[in-house]
Amino acid sequence: MMNFYVSTAAALAVASTVLAFTGQSHATAFAAWQVAGVPFGDTLNVRKYPSNASQKQAAYPNGTILQMTGKCTGGLNLLEIAGKPNWKQKQAIRYQWCQVWHDPAQNGGFVTGWVYGKYLVPY
């Protein structure tokens, strides 16, 4: 009988751990958006702060997939618009700066930066 209780307790512990990590990963999940609409021969700049005058961290061409943190200027949260059609999502961020998680040096040193939403589409 003791083995039954130990097995049940172990199964519940594993299940609760899996559920905790599942919920946690959903809360911290990044949304993938793609760079698009940048003029030929140009790139989308990632800035340290949400401003054209801010320090440039990196630049990405059309087709690059960026990982968004979900936070945009104007109080916009990408998780709140995630269920809408792509055109409505794009329209919502068109004039906003959105935060990305990227690796400008491509050495595993990920940092946050800001990109202008006009050049992003949901991926």
Which residues does each predicted region cover?
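Beta-loop motif signature
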Residues: A31-A32, V38-Q91, W101
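Preference for short coil/turn "hinge" residues that link or interrupt alpha-helices
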Residues: L12-V14, P39, A53, G108
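Long, non-globular low-complexity/IDR segments in eukaryotic proteins
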Residues: M1-A32, D42, Y119-Y123
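Boundary regions of SH3-family modules and the immediately adjacent low-complexity/disordered segments
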Residues: G23, T28-W33, Q55, K84-Y123
